[in-house]
Amino acid sequence: MRLTSTSFANDATLPVEFAFGKVASEGHVALSSNRNPHLAWSDVPDGTLSSFVVVCHDPDVPSRGDDVDREDREVPHDLPRVDFFHWVLINLPADAREIVAGTHSHGVTPRGKKGPRPDLPVADGVRHGLNDYTGWFAGDADMKGDYYGYDGACPPWNDSIVHRYVFTVYAVDVPRLEIPEHHALTGAQVLAALQGHVLAEAAVTATYSLNPRLAG
């Protein structure tokens, strides 16, 4: 199975239009265009293929927030890192081969895009999961809410490392993952539900930083 994107090259910098945040002309961070990137997959398995799942995660998020966005320091490079899910999309039909750039997100939506089935050009049964901005903004009176669908990169502006954004497409042997409709669909729940059902997978990775020292 092969995954490609016309929006970025594998292991190259994510263009700012596909990020949630960008380096500000004044201050540190400004909101960006927040468009979802293009993804296309090929060489899919034959036989029992029934659906696809798309996940985007950042494996480089600081495990503690003590140093995040502090003027007098950077987040240490050796701090343990954890996953942050930016996009969870399940039950894409077996004949799907592409997601067009900007069709699942275009601009930042304060308090989050609607879900689990936003008004998007997708087939019946497709579900958008909650991304981890739901937890990140939980204490922000202006931004808190349920963040469904894609919301792009916005790493700490003082992080000492460049973050990676891993887009993975899974070919699955069931038409719908067994996750109760009333449950809030998270990245962790999807990865658990995928166990034993993945026929093939492919990934592409983009990098991004808001640290002027690293962003160039």
Model regions and ranges:
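N-terminus-centered regions that define maturation/targeting leaders and the start
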Residues: 1-216
